[in-house]
């Protein structure tokens, strides 16, 4: 008799497969970085194209021209509206205090509605001084930036996304000095990211609604003689007689897509400015294809060119951070030589 081998279909690692709580992805873990900089950035997914580049990675194709699919993420400057400080608590980090900038855009007030009406520059400077005293006294163990996006700069929408980003480095005083310098100012992607480095991409995937077990879990369609009433797109057995309940591990129909996902080690091929990519000192090229990116339009601001595909639909908020578990053989942290960028219509 042949060996019976029937591995389960689908991974249980992501159960329960339900919709994400928020369309703005969260980052729970930050990489260790010796450079004092904001650890990541955020933008909006525009679409995909492809390029030809000289491969600079170790391998058989090194030094040769290769085809590479890339995703374009538009990244208008982020605005640093606050500083959040953490102290060491009994169960981990606890928020010690926050300092918010006193002048916020009217669009931001659609999202943030807890700022006191009498909060002015004098109150802001007083709060900043109190936080500096806590840092000097050693009560603060970590300092992070509170930032918001500016989608109105690219004519996408008005209400921004609000998020928190860690700061690299080991010295808390250096982190605070960096945050104090950046609060109330704009941050561009070229200030915090390096061309050629590896990134982790965090986003909420495309939503597909309720789907059956064949598409959702990848189970086999039943042989026609085993089907019940001609229906074979279901599991043949929901489980044993005992225990007298259906186990949660049985693949069944339900929500598919709109899940919070992280994809590791995506290389940042290039960073462009104002919708254009500078190829050399004399030549630059617009990244927008003929007719614009489908369902998105024209790239007006800075953008990231990321290798391969990333989760999420067009116009969705995408967050990136430096790779938290890079491979041993990393590509060089520099832009590879790009010989061709496809600008043909994607319609």
Swiss-Prot record:
PROSITE patterns: RIBOSOMAL_L3 (PS00474). InterPro entries: L3_arc_euk (IPR045077), Ribosomal_L3_dom_3_arc_sf (IPR044892), Ribosomal_uL3 (IPR000597), Ribosomal_uL3_arc (IPR019928), Ribosomal_uL3_CS (IPR019926), Transl_B-barrel_sf (IPR009000). Keywords: Ribonucleoprotein, Ribosomal protein, RNA-binding, rRNA-binding. Gene3D superfamilies: 3.30.1430.10, Ribosomal protein L3, domain 3, Translation factors. Residues 325-347 are annotated as: Disordered. One of its GO terms (molecular function) is rRNA binding. One of its GO terms (biological process) is translation. One of its GO terms (cellular component) is cytosolic large ribosomal subunit. Part of the 50S ribosomal subunit. Forms a cluster with proteins L14 and L24e. Belongs to the universal ribosomal protein uL3 family. One of the primary rRNA binding proteins, it binds directly near the 3'-end of the 23S rRNA, where it nucleates assembly of the 50S subunit. This is Large ribosomal subunit protein uL3. The lineage of its organism: Archaea, Methanobacteriati, Methanobacteriota, Thermococci, Thermococcales.
